[in-house]
């Protein structure tokens, strides 16, 4: 009957919403290091009712990553050569970070250590942007003066959180807006 089909559709929709919320929760927990990559992969298999390997899950997760244009890497190298202290603060997971280090950052013999003095990752700090504590930790570990620092991020909420601590910000709305900054 139509009523039974409608009820089945509603149940299926609710399951889909629940599984989507569960996936977001898992990514959030992985993103701040509350669960390991192995635990994440196990949960992903349970959620999707599949028997795929950890390697297959990691490959699928990394497909969402985009190229870092050479122009950006050249600009980072130039800024560092000018004496700017460059740090990277990223809400990322080790799965993605390992891929970025291996595949996206290498450029003409350079690697991630050549661009940044230090890298701060949410999964390793057990905090994520826009939580003020992650910025405070970067300020402390990097020994930077907020009023003399510029934070570039694509999300307004992350910029606002940094501004609240006295850090100058630039919201990078388009993929490469920050390249136009006069530094």
Where are these regions (language model features)?
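Soluble or luminal CAZymes and related metallo-dependent hydrolases
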Residues: 36, 64-71, 130, 134
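Generic hydrophobic alpha-helical segments
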Residues: 26-30, 76, 116
